[in-house]
Amino acid sequence: AERTAAPALTLQPTRLHTLLAHGVDQLAASAACELGWEIVAPLPFGRALNVAINAQPQSHADGMALLAGGEASDPGVQARANGIRHWSDRARLFQLADRDAEIAVLFEATLASPEDAVRARRFHAAAGSQAALAGKIMVEQSDLLIGVWDNGSRDGVGGTGHTIVRALEIGTPVLLLEPARPEHRSILSSTESLAGWQ
């Protein structure tokens, strides 16, 4: 009997899926880049709106400048914008920009009237919904989710806790790290396992 050779196994490239937010997301992107991994970023918005929102401007002028692709006058806001732009240039982006026009109007209105709680709620609901969608895409493409979380709210749509719960619900294991105690880590495989994690 004639034997046929088994096909050679090929390793697929290691990818980091991240939303590129300021902080842990960008630290992870830096480490992944050093290891030669591909960086994939499902952004909750188109690139310009993503930079403008996630740089967290406090003034209308800074928000509008960033939205137009310019610079913010606040150094902290500009530093966050630079970080997001830097990693966006190095990542393969999937931009969820279909609601950008609507959300940009809400973003501008919130910055123009920061004391208006109704406008703020509308903006945060729309932005949170987009962040949740980007998080869902990220989780669905991941073999393991690494969550750096203080075990705070799970109710904030699109937030870290929400994304961790979503991953566990669809069967993606989560390596959970507590920022105040990095030596305290657990690998979780179900939402029930969150109850005992503290």
Residue ranges of each PLM-predicted region?
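Acidic/glycine-enriched connector segments
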Residues: 1-197
